[in-house]
């Protein structure tokens, strides 16, 4: 009986200790309530403890005796430990006996409760577990009072004291236990409530006992009636129950301690207070052991677990008593240590059961056993409530890296913390410039799993820095386009935040929330209806703060609302206008409303809806949330907290695939620490829908070309720092350019060369050296040549010259192939002035380097025939003539010999076709001024064949000979004029039959009539002027001729002799030239263009000093009004006769103008029409008369001016009569000299005009039929004006000369009148008389 009581007591104590250690967290959560109730119990029971002090002393004495008796009965504790299953019957007896004892104890507890409730019924609250403990303690004390138990206990105490002296004592005062016992005591499964945050537990362990287990336990336990019967002592006296609340007096504590020595066998180290006071390390060790040994649940463990749940924790009073045991005397400690064998013996049934279960569980391993102790420490440090001890960051990262199991809570918790940290860091770093980079980094993190963290971070960052609201809104718009659920969550939280702040009258939070919502409206994340609802809410019941918030909100999204819903914002502004008119608000708010109206009037120009740099999402890609102000109800704050994910690895892979689709192939650097995926069911659907969306940007491309700029800078500095090209090439070859950078080097050579003021051979040699070193540089230079030719119009003259010389150097050194010339098409349509200048300088440079012969031989090479087909075209005679004239004009006519032969041997029908093309085009194909010819239109009567051109030449020459004085020319031209006239008439008859020529002739006739009428009017006016001038001249001549008649006759004779001699020479030369030209025209009628080109070359040879030579002889910039010729050989062209031209150049500007006038009027005589010829002859005669009159008037004017200068009344009045005679004689002499010089000039002019007419006959014959009469009249008028201007200039010069002469003569006379002696005067008189 005593053994069973002891065993039941020990089992109950051990189970209670297990419960207390296992439910540590539950005790913490209820500590405050339990401690407060314990304190009330102590205060209420202090009075009761004083009354019961005497009774407890008696019971203590009885308990000592009962212990001694029971010591003898408990002799075989170890045998029961080894063979617990061998005696099932005895065990059942012990259980039934303990049940009876428990029944008696319950009766004692009920009596004790009745007494205690009388004192403090309201304060004391006892649990069923406390009642059971009280019952067990009272039953044990009752049994231990028997005499046999006292004797046995006394004997056993002696033996146990000896054993205790030999056993070493632990640090906490308890004796050592066997390893099996220690494992059984330390490995105690906790209750379901004792789970710390982040603790790894088994789910099966936390389950409550099932109904079947409860039924089995209830069937095994004895009924309450038997317990009540056994609760009384053998003598029939009811025993006093042990009170749960103990008195604070030391005597009562000693009595209770001594009374419970035999029953409370648990050592000090096993108390819950001791366990709680131990270090964290010990608790972790216990938890580890508990996880390792807990695998299966059998029936026995289910029973124990049911008991543990029923009993619960010990009361707070017992915990205080256990804590006070530390202060007890060494005797109490020795007494307690002496009772440890009994406790060991009392625990044997439980230990046997646990050893059986441990033996069975050794073969089973749970997943939780995979986590090492180091990993568990890391998790505890991260997840414990107190934070744990400080661990350096490096060590912490090392500990975290050792956790690799993604399915564990430790790994997921670490990943969650890293995700939170990375999202917060990215949000704090975002700005306008790096928003694209930050967005890509955020999309690499699992923002679907951490969408709550992302929304919270963005809202907090925006509230902290409202000036960056537009940046955060742009970031949200980008994320919303990919994950609309994130944008919706953030918008919900913002709306709820605004409503809460509006109810609390928190203006600052309202301002920040509305500002963010306004920018989300601008970015099309939120619908404009939400903005209008907020504005209506703020303005409906206006206050100072609400109107201020509304104004701030309107400034942010007013432009967008005006674009989207003008009526809605108009209604809001009307409400604001009414508020302003009421005037109930503060003055400051009224001013703010007025400012807002002004901003609206300006069109919100200072408050743009979206900054251009932040307009990153297309309108079609954006997802707009239509959310009303009352719809947002749930903020989903649970998303801000860590949540364990069973399918962590699967969701992580899903998000990685989604991130790759969004970001493209640039996902290799994604961080694994923050990766993960949301475990919600809706995330899969969202990922499926978002997977169809593509990335906004691909690979990162450096648009600034930083590396290219650095390379160009290095090449430029290397080129400029080198002394010669060899050193520069050596340095550049050391740079080890990457593949593809060769073309940049070639471009730098050309750019540096073009930048120079003049071409430097350094760059050509440098490029040549690179082409010779490596052939990889040849294709880039050839490509650059073609590109440069196509873009020559972008280069100025200096750059164009340097570039063309640069490529000329590469060509003549054969650094690049001559096949690059195939890109040049030398014709009128495909060239520009810049391209012609480029070709000109290129070939001139090649001719200078190679010589004309070598260059011609190179171009005639069979390999280059196809490449130079564009330079020397043979497809069209028009293009052929253009090429011939171009190269001839730049001084390289020798290159066109083959083209001339080709054009000479071409059939005659080709020029006719060319003439039709020209007639349809309506102008000269050489509009760029390739030869010095007049700007004339194609006459309808012009013939395209070379024979017709020769006919017109001979006819014009015959007509001119008939009007001139030279008989030799007329005889030579008349001989061949008659048959040619017949041919010409036939050609004219054929051409007149054409409709196009008739229409053109009509137009030209109308124009000619108009011009004739205008000319006649001008002529009449000129005649009137001339008549007036002639009258004046005649009066002057009569006076002057009487004085100088003799001297004029002498000078006339001399001038005639000189003019006859020079005229004969000129006539001989002109006749020879005209005969040569006529012969050449008659002999070579088929090759007229070639003859013209030869004449052009002859012109180039006969350059004379007075004329400024053009650089190219080919007008590359455009045609001049006077310098044009027709490519078919029939245009006007000016012959340059050496003798006549040289004399004309040497004469004064007046003579040149006169020759131009004569030639212009002579050209008008070239038409075959007789009426027109007569009119032309009449005009020429008028012109001659007018010129003569002008010359006479000019001479008279000069004489009049001189005679005025000589008339000095002062000198004549003061001087002697002899001096007056001298002055008159001088004036006569001067007048005679002027007359002679003027006559000489007139005679020279006539002779020159005759010579010019004879020398220009060939030229007139070429140009006669192509020049329009209107243009001739215009030229005549221009020549007249130029003549008048030149005459005015000459008059001014003469006047200046005369004034200077007068001044000098005056000075001489003044000096002579003073110093001359009478001798000199007499000698002068004698000379004058003689």
Curated annotation (Swiss-Prot):
Keyword Nuclease: no
Region annotation (Disordered) ranges: 1-377, 660-697, 926-1330
Keyword terms: mRNA processing, mRNA splicing, Nucleus, Phosphoprotein
Residue numbers of Phosphotyrosine PTMs: 1182
GO cellular component annotations of the record: catalytic step 2 spliceosome; nuclear speck; spliceosomal complex
Annotated Basic residues bias: 252-277, 980-1012, 1034-1054, 1321-1330
Residue ranges of every copy of the MIF4G domain listed in the record: 420-603
SUPFAM superfamilies given in the database record: ARM repeat
SMART domains membership: MA3 (SM00544), MIF4G (SM00543)
Residue span, MI domain: 710-826
Modified residues (Phosphothreonine): 191, 201, 1108
Bias (Low complexity): 9-36, 99-113, 355-366, 665-678, 941-951, 964-976, 1072-1082
Biased composition (Polar residues): 138-148, 168-177
InterPro entries given in the database record: ARM-type_fold, CWC22_splicing_factor, Initiation_fac_eIF4g_MI, MIF4G-like_typ-3
Sites bearing Phosphoserine, chain numbering: 219, 221, 1111, 1121, 1180-1181
Molecular functions (GO terms): RNA binding
Compartment(s) where it occurs, according to its Swiss-Prot or TrEMBL record: Nucleus speckle
Keyword Transferase carried by entry: no
Residue spans of biased composition, Acidic residues class: 679-689, 952-963
GO BP terms, alphabetized: mRNA splicing, via spliceosome
Biased composition (Basic and acidic residues): 46-94, 115-135, 149-166, 191-201, 208-236, 278-307, 316-325, 1013-1033, 1089-1110, 1133-1195, 1203-1320
Quaternary structure, from the entry: Component of the spliceosome C complex. Interacts with eIF4AIII.
Family: Belongs to the CWC22 family.
Function: Required for pre-mRNA splicing and for exon-junction complex (EJC) assembly. Hinders eIF4AIII from non-specifically binding RNA and escorts it to the splicing machinery to promote EJC assembly on mature mRNAs.
PANTHER family linked to this entry: CELL CYCLE CONTROL PROTEIN CWF22-RELATED (PTHR18034), PRE-MRNA-SPLICING FACTOR CWC22 HOMOLOG (PTHR18034:SF3)
Protein's name according to its UniProt entry: Pre-mRNA-splicing factor CWC22 homolog
Species assigned in the record: Drosophila melanogaster
The gene coding this protein: ncm
């Amino acid at each position: 009986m005593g053994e069973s009581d002891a065993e039941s007591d020990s089992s109950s104590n051990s189970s209670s200790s297990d419960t207390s250690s296992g439910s540590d967290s539950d005790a913490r959560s209820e500590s405050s309530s339990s401690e407060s109730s314990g304190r009330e119990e102590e205060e209420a029971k202090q009075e009761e403890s004083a009354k019961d002090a005497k009774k407890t002393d008696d019971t203590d004495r009885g308990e000592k005796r009962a212990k001694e008796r029971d010591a003898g009965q408990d002799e075989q504790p170890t045998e029961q430990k080894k063979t617990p299953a061998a005696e099932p019957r005895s065990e059942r007896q012990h259980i039934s006996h303990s049940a009876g004892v428990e029944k008696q104890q319950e009766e004692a507890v009920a009596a004790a409760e009745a007494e205690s409730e009388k004192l403090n019924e309201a304060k004391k609250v006892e649990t069923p577990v406390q009642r059971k403990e009280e019952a067990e303690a009272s039953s044990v004390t009752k049994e231990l009072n028997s005499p046999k138990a006292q004797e046995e206990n006394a004997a056993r105490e002696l033996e146990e004291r000896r054993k205790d002296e030999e056993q070493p004592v632990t640090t906490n005062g308890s004796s050592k236990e066997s390893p099996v016992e220690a494992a059984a005591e330390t490995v105690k499964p906790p209750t379901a409530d004792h789970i710390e945050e982040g603790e790894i537990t088994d789910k099966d362990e936390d389950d409550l006992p099932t109904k079947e287990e409860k039924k089995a336990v209830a069937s095994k336990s004895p009924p309450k009636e038997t317990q009540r019967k056994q609760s009384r002592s053998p003598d029939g006296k009811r025993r006093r129950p042990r009170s749960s609340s103990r008195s604070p007096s030391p005597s009562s504590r000693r009595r209770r301690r001594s009374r419970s020595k035999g029953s409370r066998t648990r050592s000090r180290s096993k108390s819950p207070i001791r366990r709680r006071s131990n270090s964290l390390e010990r608790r972790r060790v216990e938890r580890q052991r508990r996880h390792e040994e807990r695998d299966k649940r059998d029936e026995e463990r289910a029973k124990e677990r049911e008991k543990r749940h029923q009993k619960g924790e010990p009361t707070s009073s017992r915990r205080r008593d256990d804590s006070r045991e530390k202060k007890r005397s060494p005797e109490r400690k020795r007494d307690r240590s002496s009772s440890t064998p009994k406790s060991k013996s009392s625990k044997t049934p439980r230990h046997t059961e646990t050893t059986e279960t441990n033996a069975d569980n050794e073969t089973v391993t749970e997943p939780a056993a995979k986590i090492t102790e180091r990993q568990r420490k890391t998790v505890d440090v991260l997840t414990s409530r107190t934070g744990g001890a400080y661990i350096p960051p490096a060590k912490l990262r090392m500990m975290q890296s050792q956790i690799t199991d993604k399915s564990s809570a430790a790994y997921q918790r670490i990943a969650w913390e890293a995700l939170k940290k990375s999202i917060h860091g990215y949000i704090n770093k975002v700005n306008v410039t790096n928003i694209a980079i930050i967005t890509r980094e955020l999309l690499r993190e699992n923002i679907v799993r951490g969408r709550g963290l992302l929304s919270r971070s963005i809202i907090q960052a925006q509230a902290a820095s409202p000036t960056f609201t537009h940046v955060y809104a742009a970031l949200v718009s980008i994320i919303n386009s990919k994950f609309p659920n994130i944008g919706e969550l953030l918008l919900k939280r913002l709306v709820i935040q605004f409503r809460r702040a509006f109810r609390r009258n928190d203006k600052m939070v309202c301002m920040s929330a509305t500002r963010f919502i306004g920018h989300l409206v601008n970015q099309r994340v939120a619908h404009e209806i939400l903005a209008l609802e907020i504005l209506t809410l703020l303005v409906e019941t206006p206050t100072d703060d609400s109107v201020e918030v509304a104004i701030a909100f309107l400034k942010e999204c007013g432009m967008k609302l005006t674009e989207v819903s003008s009526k809605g914002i108009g209604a809001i502004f009307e409400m604001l206008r009414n508020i302003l008119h009421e005037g109930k608000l503060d003055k400051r708010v009224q001013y703010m409303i007025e400012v807002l109206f002004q901003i609206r009037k300006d069109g919100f120009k200072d408050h743009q809806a979206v900054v251009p740099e932040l307009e990153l999402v297309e309108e079609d890609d954006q997802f707009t949330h239509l959310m009303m102000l009352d719809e947002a109800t749930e903020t989903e704050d649970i998303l801000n907290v860590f949540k364990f994910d069973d399918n962590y690895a699967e969701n992580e892979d899903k998000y990685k695939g989604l991130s790759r689709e969004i970001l493209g192939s640039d996902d290799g650097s994604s961080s694994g620490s923050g990766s993960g995926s949301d475990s919600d069911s809706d995330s899969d659907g969202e990922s499926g829908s978002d997977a169809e969306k593509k990335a906004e940007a691909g690979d990162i491309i450096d648009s600034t070309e930083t590396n290219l700029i650095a390379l160009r800078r290095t090449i430029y500095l290397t080129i400029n720092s080198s002394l010669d090209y060899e050193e520069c090439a050596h340095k550049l070859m050391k740079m080890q350019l990457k593949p593809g950078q060769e073309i940049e080097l070639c471009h730098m050579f050309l750019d540096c060369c073009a930048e120079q003021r003049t071409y430097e051979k350094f760059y050509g040699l440098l490029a040549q050296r690179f082409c010779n070193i490596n052939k990889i540089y040849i294709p880039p230079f050839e490509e650059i040549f073609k590109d440069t030719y196509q873009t020559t119009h972008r280069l100025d003259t200096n750059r164009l010259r340097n570039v063309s010389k640069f490529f000329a150097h590469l060509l003549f050194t054969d650094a690049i192939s001559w096949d690059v010339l195939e890109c040049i098409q030398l014709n009128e349509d495909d060239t520009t002035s810049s391209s012609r200048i480029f070709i000109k300088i290129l070939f001139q440079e090649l001719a200078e380097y190679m010589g004309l012969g070598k260059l011609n031989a190179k171009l005639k090479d069979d390999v280059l025939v196809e490449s130079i087909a564009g330079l020397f075209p043979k497809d069209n005679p028009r293009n052929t003539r253009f090429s011939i004239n171009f190269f001839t004009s730049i001084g390289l006519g020798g290159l066109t010999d083959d083209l001339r032969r080709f054009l000479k041997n071409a059939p005659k029908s080709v020029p006719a076709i060319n003439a039709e093309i020209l007639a349809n085009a309506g102008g000269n194909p050489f509009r760029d001024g390739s030869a010095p010819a007049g700007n004339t239109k194609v006459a309808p009567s012009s013939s395209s064949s070379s024979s017709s051109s020769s006919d017109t030449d001979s006819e014009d020459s015959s007509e001119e000979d008939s009007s001139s004085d030279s008989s030799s020319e007329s005889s030579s031209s008349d001989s061949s004029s008659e048959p040619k006239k017949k041919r010409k008439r036939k050609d004219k008859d054929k051409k007149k039959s054409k409709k196009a020529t008739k229409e053109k002739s009509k137009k030209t006739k109308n124009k000619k009539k108009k011009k004739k009428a205008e000319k006649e009017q001008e002529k009449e006016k000129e005649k009137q002027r001339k008549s007036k001038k002639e009258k004046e001249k005649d009066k002057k001549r009569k006076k002057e001729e009487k004085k100088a008649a003799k001297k004029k006759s002498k000078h006339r004779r001399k001038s005639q002799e000189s003019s006859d001699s020079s005229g004969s020479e000129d006539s001989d030369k002109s006749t020879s030239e005209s005969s040569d030209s006529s012969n050449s025209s008659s002999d070579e009628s088929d090759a007229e263009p070639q003859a013209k080109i030869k004449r052009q070359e002859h012109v180039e040879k006969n350059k004379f000093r007075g004329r400024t030579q053009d650089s190219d002889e080919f007008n590359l910039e455009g045609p001049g009004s006077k310098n044009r010729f027709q490519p078919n050989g029939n245009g006007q062209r000016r012959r340059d006769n050496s003798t006549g031209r040289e004399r004309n150049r040497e004469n004064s500007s007046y003579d040149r103008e006169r020759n131009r006038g004569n030639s212009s009027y002579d050209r008008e005589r070239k038409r075959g029409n007789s009426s027109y010829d007569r009119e032309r002859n009449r005009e020429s005669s008028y012109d001659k008369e007018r010129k003569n009159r002008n010359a006479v008037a000019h001479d008279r004017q000069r004489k009049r001016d001189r005679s005025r200068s000589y008339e000095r009344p002062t000198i004549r009045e003061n001087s002697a009569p002899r001096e007056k005679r001298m002055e008159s004689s001088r004036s006569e002499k001067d007048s005679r000299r002027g007359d002679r010089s003027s006559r000489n000039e007139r005679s020279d002019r006539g002779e020159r005009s005759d010579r010019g007419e004879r020398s220009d006959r060939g030229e007139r014959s070429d140009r006669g039929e192509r020049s329009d009469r209107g243009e001739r009249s215009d030229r005549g008028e221009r020549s007249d004006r130029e003549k008048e201007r030149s005459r005015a200039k000459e008059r001014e010069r003469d006047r200046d000369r005369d004034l200077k002469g007068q001044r000098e003569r005056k000075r001489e006379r003044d000096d002579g009148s003073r110093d001359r002696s009478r001798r000199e005067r007499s000698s002068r008189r004698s000379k004058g008389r003689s």
